[in-house]
């Protein structure tokens, strides 16, 4: 019987529910689905049907009705199924959902249908449930309902009835927890199955608390509630615990009926709480937030984020079950019973119908509260101790063993628990003794306790709405959150509230008290205080830390010492280390700059650490602000501000002298960016003498040298020392030119350096030279950054001679040496000391050719320049040549030219330097003659008083043109100034097409340093830039295609030679090294002007608009075309320096010098020497030589081109090497010459087809590829076009060669004693070279791959020979059988058979020893014993042949003339074995096999061994083995990794067959793996697998 469905108005039945019990299926719905809005399809009901949980108190019949309804909804029999199917399905499902404790009993009964099953279950309940007057409802739901109605409070009977029905449905879910059922189809993993039974002792819990519970109620229905309570307790008391299961079930149901009420919407409340309906509420589904005090409070229970719904009650029930009934297995009992504890209407009916968890929770609380009030409740030991109850009260909220609700454990943010208890607990909570709030009453209840059911444990405040109570609890949680450092996992609502309420108080500025939501905002705010404090510190010159430490310490206290990061430079603080790292980049730049910075600091010995105290930091920087502008002195707090500020000075003149000691400001215009990158570190090395900061310690040391030499300029008649520094790193576009002020007669020293490091490298010898008066010293140095690597080689100075020349290293260091020699002039008058130092970006380490201009007292000067050919040529530097100047120790000028660019040949200084006639002047034009001539013609820079100053006209590369206190960029040709280098660049293009007229009054010194790709360079500069590609190494007289090659070479031989070669005459053009001791020696005679680089034909042609290639003379209208063209020459082969004693200078057309000195404009063909008056004619002429190598100086002893008077250059390549006179490209195999490389390629194919690559004959031939063969133009040492340098094999294209070269990777290069590798003509190989020799023809190879290909030819021949030999053998065998059959049988049968095993046994040993023979001495010894072992049989060490010698001797009368037909065919093999017969000798050398020679007899009397190294013959294998030892140290035999190498054959004789069968029995053995093959071809193919 179903109980009457008394539904109050506040609990309307859902329209979607088919009946009252369908609401129970809400447990199966998804947590986020709201009942009434869920899906209605069959699958939805199917899931509900499958996941229905059996609730014991609902009753079996009700459960059956529920299942049928769900199944109908699911199966829809009107359309899909029949009734019988439904019945079976229901039965199956019913059997699945019955309690586990009943399943065995029910299954034993085997019910046939659902009715029988229900009957069994009802009988079971009646069987184990004792009869009682007051609890007749125990046997059936109707009785239970009736009893509850009778005992229900009168104030809300109807409502309570409805609530009871709903609670029954809740109980039906709770009493049979899902955990008890094994729902395999349930996707939501339920908790382990549990037993819902309660211990028997639980029944007495309410027996003792019954009266106390009634007394504790403070509303009208107290008596009624007490009566219902008494009834329930009576039921428990009357029942005897005869059956444990029955007692548990009975007790459980009664306790649940007295517990909290299950709201009518309890079922679907699970669907709306945001947690899984089973996985999170698997233990107590009915109590999961669907429990409410009244139906009206349904909506509030659906809220999410409410913490007291499931968790607290579930934990309470769990603890109750644990503490009270240790044997309880009811997972449902530990389900959240939050809602039940918050519902005020707790009539007896409701108590009965309330879910188990809620009842247990309420009972537990009642028990405690009764005892807590010390009255009413008879709390005896049968229940649980008072202490345990109190403990549970205090700790149930913090229960974390997973039994309670997820919300309680994780989502509840309150620090103290709050909980909705029963009616009794309401009263107790109002008295502030209970921390658990009570559910509100219904409207019919007059007591105010019902309106304020939720009491805060912290402050005692009560709330009627749970949401308000939760928010109130959040406030306490937030307040205590940071105090205890605890983190709470709370619901979304709590998170949002906390985020909004916590942020404002978290980050507070300790200085001003301002608060921030984020630490980043606080950090930004603190910057204001930090900067203000910095200013204050600066004003007070305090030496303390920038930021006050208290804030930092306080923050450390808050966040921990490891959680706060402070910038040691500006004292800004950060919460994260990553933020600090990003911030520090402002101070120190990127990591790379930091690394360089610290490296430089270590070199200097002072490591800059921003972390130390500020006083040290300020001491380092002179108590100034960290970043100071070196131009205007303005200081900045941050390097970025300084960088921005420095941009202002790039438009002006950054070279203002700021101090007397050091007036240098290193802010180069072109490299400003690079400079600025390191400006934040510029104060790392603060020189005490000035305001300059040096980025590197090396710069500091060099700069200190400047100060040690500055005394020369300061206080000795020099008012200024202007050092213009600008790195040359990009394209050496230095357009710096010093125009000495005409109004300045005072002695000045202008040091113009394109490299900031240049000024740091002022000569170290300057202090030595103290002269009476120095009119002017112009030091022009175009140095690159890499130039710092070069070393200074200035020789010891001789002050008394004062004619010291500085050896310029390839950097600004040559400045030091230049100035050392340049300012040493000591005489009555010193017209000028011109020190021109052109340093390129990768300056070669060749020694600078310093031309010394010596003048006697009469004004005579001699410019000494060594010739390439050790010939000193003395040419009058001016109309009045100085005679005897070499003996005069007073020199008018010391012209020290240091050209350390990649092409320093072009230094021919002393143009006007030798023309001093008391009032004469040596005007030394800079590297660009044309530029200087223009300046000279316009009298812009050189017309100063008495011609006492000479102008250093540097190259107009677009670099800053410095005019003291003038505009930054000045045109060197016309004097026009520009504010931007780009404007000057555009302007210079106008001059690039103009050619100034030469002047006869000055001897020209062509000093050019030009980047070939610089589009801003003039025509003459372009020519020189191309010539730079032919860098010449003075040390080894070698050409290099690029400055990088030369620099690399010089790194090796940089310091091997002396820098003071005085009279050897081997100094390279512009690189002659004259130590300072040289100047003043008697050897210096007349002025010698070196003209190695005097071949700029177009330099002085003002009408020529064509850019001429200095290498081949081709003209180009566009500079970029010339640049591209020069790339071809940059890869041309060069002469190996070791083979020749003199450096071969690529001297361009002598027309340059002819123009300089005769005014003629000639364009000379560098190839044949023919000259032309215009470059266009030369252009046409050069097409003939376009593919030729310009200079093949293999036999050239003289690379110097004589100065005036000069004749057209002869083709010295043809003179030195007549073989090259006809054509430059020559076949290395046959010597045939070709005009173009393509013809040679076609010709080489013929050689490859004929296999005529004779490498040993190609040693003296040189391939000079042309334009079309740029791939081959690596070096002149590469003799073949695409020839492998290891094995000599040639290839058509470089790709094939590249693939081939990988085979030789990591192979050593060493020659044998009698072997010469033809691919390397000038340089010995550097490792061991394996020796491979063809056994068939005796040809030698240095790599197995070549031998492999070579052997293929022999294999083809052998196959043909074997075929022919097979036929001949057959005929021979027939003939032998006819004439001497007995002899043949005897030879091949008995004796041969007897000797063969020993031979074969010895042969593997010999072959096994062959690899050792190749590698070491055991060769011969291993072979010797084997041979000797076989000798008794064969009278020789030949295993295969001489073993048969006794037989041959014995049977010679009969079989002497017998020859095997295959012997001839195999004869090449024997010879093929011979080359490695060093190791393989026993197999074939000197052995006349039975098959050998068709027309020859078997030669066994005199065996011999031929040595292929020395062609010596031995008759004994022992002697031969000993002889091989002599070659072991010279030749390394590579063991058996090529075709035919060390491959012997094993010949097996047959007694039953003749020679033909012997051929069939012959096997060839691989010496690598020992595998046998029938023919040599198979062996060769097999060995190819070993060689790869």
From Swiss-Prot:
Residues 1397-1417 are annotated as: 3 X 7 AA repeat of P-E-V-E-A-A-E. Residues 128-230, 266-306, 319-349, 588-610, 838-930, 1056-1104, 1393-1495 are annotated as: Disordered. Residues 1418-1443 are annotated as: 4 X 5 AA repeat of P-X-G-E-A. One of its GO terms (molecular function) is zinc ion binding. Residues 46-128 form the SCAN box domain. Residues 143-152, 161-182, 206-225, 295-306, 588-607, 868-881, 1071-1082 have a biased composition (Basic and acidic residues). Sequence repeats lie at residues 1397-1403, 1404-1410, 1411-1417, 1418-1422, 1425-1429, 1432-1436, 1439-1443. SUPFAM superfamilies: beta-beta-alpha zinc fingers, Retrovirus capsid dimerization domain-like. It is found in: Nucleus; Cytoplasm. Residues 129-142, 1395-1415, 1449-1466, 1475-1495 have a biased composition (Acidic residues). Keywords: Apoptosis, Cytoplasm, Metal-binding, Nucleus, Repeat, Zinc, Zinc-finger. It comes from the Eukaryota. Homodimer. Interacts with SIAH1A and SIAH2. Interacts with TRAF2. Belongs to the krueppel C2H2-type zinc-finger protein family. The SCAN domain enables PEG3 homo- or heterodimerization to control gene expression in a combinatorial fashion. This is Paternally-expressed gene 3 protein. It comes from Pan paniscus.
């Amino acid at each position: 019987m179903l109980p009457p469905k008394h539904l109050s108005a506040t609990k309307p039945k859902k329209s979607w529910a088919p009946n009252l019990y369908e609401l129970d299926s809400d447990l199966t719905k998804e947590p986020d689905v709201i009942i009434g809005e869920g899906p209605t399809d069959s699958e939805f009901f199917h899931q509900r049907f499958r996941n229905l949980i059996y609730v014991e108190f609902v009753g079996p019949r009700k459960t059956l009705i529920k299942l049928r309804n769900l199944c109908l909804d699911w199966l829809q029999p009107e359309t899909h199924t029949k009734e019988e199917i439904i019945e079976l399905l229901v039965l199956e499902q019913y059997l699945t959902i019955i309690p586990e404790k009943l399943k065995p009993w029910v299954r034993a009964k085997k019910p046939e249908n659902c009715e029988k099953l229900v009957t069994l279950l009802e009988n079971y309940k009646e069987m184990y449930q004792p009869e009682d007057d007051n609890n007749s409802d125990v046997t059936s739901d109707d009785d239970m309902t009736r009893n509850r109605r009778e005992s229900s409070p009168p104030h809300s009977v109807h409502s309570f009835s409805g609530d009871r029905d709903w609670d029954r449905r809740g109980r039906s879910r709770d009493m049979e927890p899902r955990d008890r059922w094994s729902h395999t189809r349930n996707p939501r993993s339920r908790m382990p199955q549990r037993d819902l039974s309660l211990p028997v002792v639980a029944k007495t819990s309410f027996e003792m608390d019954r009266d106390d519970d009634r007394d504790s109620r403070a509303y009208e229905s107290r008596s009624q509630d007490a009566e219902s309570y008494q009834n329930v307790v009576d039921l428990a008391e009357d029942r005897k615990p005869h059956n444990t299961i029955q007692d548990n079930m009975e007790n459980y149901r009664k306790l649940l009926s007295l517990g909290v009420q299950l709201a009518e919407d309890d079922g679907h409340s699970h669907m709306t709480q945001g947690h899984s309906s089973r996985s999170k509420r698997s233990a107590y589904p009915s109590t999961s937030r669907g429990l409410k005090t009244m139906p009206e409070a349904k909506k509030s229970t659906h809220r999410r984020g409410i913490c007291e719904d499931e968790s607290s009650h579930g934990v309470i029930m769990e603890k109750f079950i644990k503490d009270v009934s240790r044997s309880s297995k009811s997972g449902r009992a530990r389900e959240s019973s939050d809602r039940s504890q918050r519902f005020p209407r707790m009539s007896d009916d409701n108590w009965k119908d309330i879910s188990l968890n809620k009842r247990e929770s309420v009972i537990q609380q009642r028990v405690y509260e009764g005892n807590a009030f010390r009255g009413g409740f008879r709390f005896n030991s049968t229940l649980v101790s008072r202490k345990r109850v109190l403990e549970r009260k205090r700790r149930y909220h913090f229960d974390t063993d997973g039994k309670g609700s997820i919300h309680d454990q994780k989502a509840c943010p309150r620090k103290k628990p709050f909980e909705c208890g029963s009616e009794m607990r309401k009263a107790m909570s109002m008295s502030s003794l209970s921390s658990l709030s009570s559910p509100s009453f219904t409207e019919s209840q007059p007591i105010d306790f019902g309106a304020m059911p939720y009491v805060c444990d912290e402050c005692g405040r009560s709330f009627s709405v749970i949401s308000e109570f939760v928010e109130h609890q959040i406030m306490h949680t937030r307040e205590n959150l940071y105090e205890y450092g605890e983190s709470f996992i709370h619901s979304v609502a709590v998170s949002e509230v906390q985020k909004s309420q916590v942020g404002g108080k978290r980050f507070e500025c300790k200085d001003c008290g301002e608060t921030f939501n984020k630490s980043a905002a606080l950090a930004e705010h603190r910057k204001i205080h930090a900067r203000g404090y910095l200013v204050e510190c600066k004003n007070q010159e305090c030496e303390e830390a920038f930021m006050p430490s208290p804030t930092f310490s306080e923050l450390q206290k808050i966040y921990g010492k490891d959680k706060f990061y402070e910038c040691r430079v500006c004292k800004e603080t950060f919460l994260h280390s990553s933020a600090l790292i990003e911030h520090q980049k402002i101070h120190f730049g990127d990591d790379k700059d930091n690394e360089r910075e610290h490296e430089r600091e270590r070199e200097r010995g002072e490591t800059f650490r921003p972390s130390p105290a500020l006083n040290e930091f300020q001491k380092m920087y002179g108590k100034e602000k960290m970043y100071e502008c070196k131009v205007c002195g303005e200081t900045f707090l941050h390097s970025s501000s300084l960088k921005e500020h420095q941009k202002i000075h790039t438009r002006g003149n950054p070279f203002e002298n700021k101090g007397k000691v050091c007036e240098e400001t290193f802010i180069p215009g072109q490299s400003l960016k690079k400079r600025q990158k390191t400006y934040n570190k510029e104060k790392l090395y603060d020189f005490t003498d000035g305001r300059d900061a040096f980025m590197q310690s090396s710069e500091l040391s060099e700069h200190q040298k400047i100060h040690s030499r500055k005394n020369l300029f300061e206080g000795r008649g020099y008012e200024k020392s202007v050092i213009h520094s600008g790195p040359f790193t990009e394209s050496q576009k230095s357009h710096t030119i010093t125009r000495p002020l005409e109004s300045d007669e005072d002695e000045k020293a202008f040091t113009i350096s394109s490299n900031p490091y240049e000024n740091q490298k002022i000569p170290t010898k300057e202090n030595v030279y103290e002269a009476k008066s120095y009119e002017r010293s112009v030091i022009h140095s175009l140095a690159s950054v890499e130039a710092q690597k070069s070393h200074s080689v200035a020789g010891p100075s001789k002050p008394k001679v004062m004619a010291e020349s500085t050896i310029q290293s390839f950097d600004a260091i040559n400045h030091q040496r230049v100035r050392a020699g340049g300012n040493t002039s000591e005489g009555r008058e010193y017209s000028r000391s011109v020190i021109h130092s052109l340093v390129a970006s990768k300056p070669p380490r060749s020694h600078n050719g310093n031309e010394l201009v010596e003048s006697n007292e009469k004004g005579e000067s001699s410019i000494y320049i060594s010739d390439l050919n050790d010939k000193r040529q003395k040419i009058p530097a001016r109309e009045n040549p100085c005679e005897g100047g070499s003996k005069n120790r007073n020199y008018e000028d010391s012209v020290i030219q240091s050209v350390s660019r990649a092409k320093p040949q072009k230094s021919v200084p002393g143009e006007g330097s030798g023309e001093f006639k008391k009032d004469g002047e040596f005007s030394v034009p800079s590297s660009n003659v044309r530029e200087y001539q223009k300046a000279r013609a316009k009298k812009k820079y050189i017309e100063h008083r008495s011609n006492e100053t000479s102008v250093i006209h540097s190259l107009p590369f677009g670099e800053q043109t410095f005019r003291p206190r003038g505009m930054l960029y000045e045109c060197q040709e016309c004097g026009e100034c520009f504010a931007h280098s780009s404007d000057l660049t555009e302007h210079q293009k106008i001059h690039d097409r103009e050619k100034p007229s030469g002047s006869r009054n000055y001897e020209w010194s062509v000093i050019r340093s030009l980047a070939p790709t610089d589009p801003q360079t003039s025509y003459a500069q372009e020519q020189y830039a191309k010539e730079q590609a032919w860098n010449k190494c003075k040390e080894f007289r070698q050409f290099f295609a690029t400055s990088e090659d030369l620099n690399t070479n010089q790194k090796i031989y940089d310091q091997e030679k002396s820098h003071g070669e005085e009279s050897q005459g081997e100094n390279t053009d512009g690189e002659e090294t004259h130590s300072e001791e040289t100047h003043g020696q008697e050897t210096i005679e007349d002025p010698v002007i070196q003209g190695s680089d005097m071949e700029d034909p177009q330099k002085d042609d003002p009408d020529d608009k064509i850019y001429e290639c200095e290498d081949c003379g081709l003209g180009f209208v566009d500079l970029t075309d010339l640049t591209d063209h020069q790339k071809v020459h940059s890869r041309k082969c060069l002469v190996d320096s070791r083979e020749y004693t003199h450096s071969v200078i690529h001297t361009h057309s002598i027309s340059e010098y002819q123009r300089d000195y005769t005014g003629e404009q000639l364009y000379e063909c560098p190839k044949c020497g023919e000259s032309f008056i215009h470059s266009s004619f030369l252009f046409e002429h050069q097409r003939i030589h376009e593919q030729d190598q310009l200079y093949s100086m293999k036999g050239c002893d003289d690379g110097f081109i004589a100065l005036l008077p000069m004749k057209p250059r002869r083709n010295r390549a043809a003179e030195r090497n007549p073989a090259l006179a006809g054509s430059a490209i020559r076949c290395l195999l046959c010597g045939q010459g070709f005009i173009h490389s393509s013809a040679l390629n076609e010709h080489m194919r013929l050689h490859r087809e004929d296999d005529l690559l004779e490498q040993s004959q190609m040693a003296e031939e040189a391939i000079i590829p042309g334009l079309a063969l740029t791939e081959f133009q690596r070096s002149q040492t590469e003799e073949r076009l695409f020839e492998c340098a290891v094995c000599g094999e040639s290839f058509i294209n470089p790709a094939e060669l590249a693939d081939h070269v990988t085979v030789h990777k990591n192979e050593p290069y060493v020659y044998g004693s009698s072997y010469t590798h033809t691919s390397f003509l000038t340089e010995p190989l550097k490792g061991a070279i394996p020796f491979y020799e063809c056994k068939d023809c005796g040809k030698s190879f240095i790599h197995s791959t070549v031998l492999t290909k070579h052997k293929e030819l022999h294999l083809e021949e052998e196959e043909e020979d074997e075929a022919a030999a097979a036929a001949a053998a057959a005929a021979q065998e027939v003939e032998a059988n006819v004439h001497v059959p007995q002899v043949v049988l005897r030879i091949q049968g008995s004796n041969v058979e007897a000797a063969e095993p020993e031979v074969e046994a010895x042969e593997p040993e010999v072959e096994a020893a062959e690899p050792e023979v190749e590698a070491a001495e055991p060769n011969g010894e291993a072979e010797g014993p084997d041979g000797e072992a076989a000798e008794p049989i064969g009278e020789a060490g030949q295993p295969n042949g001489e073993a048969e010698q006794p037989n041959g001797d014995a049977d010679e009368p009969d079989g002497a003339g017998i020859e095997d037909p295959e012997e001839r065919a195999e004869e090449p093999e024997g010879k093929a074995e011979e080359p490695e017969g060093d190791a393989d000798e026993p197999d074939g050398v000197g052995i006349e096999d039975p098959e050998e020679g068709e027309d020859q007899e078997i030669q066994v009397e005199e065996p011999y061994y031929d040595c292929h190294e020395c062609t010596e013959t031995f008759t004994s294998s022992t002697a031969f083995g000993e002889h091989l030892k002599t070659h072991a140290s010279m030749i390394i035999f590579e063991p058996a990794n090529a075709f035919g190498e060390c491959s012997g054959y094993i010949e097996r004789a047959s007694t039953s067959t003749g020679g033909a069968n012997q051929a069939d029995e012959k096997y060839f053995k691989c010496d690598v793996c020992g595998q046998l093959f029938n023919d040599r071809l198979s062996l060769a193919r097999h060995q190819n697998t070993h060689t790869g």
